[in-house]
């Protein structure tokens, strides 16, 4: 049902804004909180912050397909057991962004190969999360998952 509602919303917004690049007008981000052995995978971005793999959804792209694509592009990993978490309405640099979060697991052993978007990666235990340079709302979610 979430997929259907999301697809309808994106289609309506693309008609209203008359653009194929809806992310310019109404940013929507999809993120995977990948858990492996009670540790969560985090990627370090260009702002030296820890983040989750993910990115922007394309027009008419299935939300789960977007997540699989973004995780593969950013980490070389395949994921499984996707579970939708509560969407978040956040502000980044004064811009409102809707973030759809999913928990996930690694589906097979593959080496992590980072894309140009990230400088480092690590798997963190629950006890290590509080000290990370990461938005507090992400920390709160991680603590409830692991």
Label for each model-derived stretch:
Residues 32, 84, 102-104:
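A structural signal for short, well-ordered beta-strand segments
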Residues 37-40, 105-110, 126-128:
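Short loop segments at secondary-structure junctions
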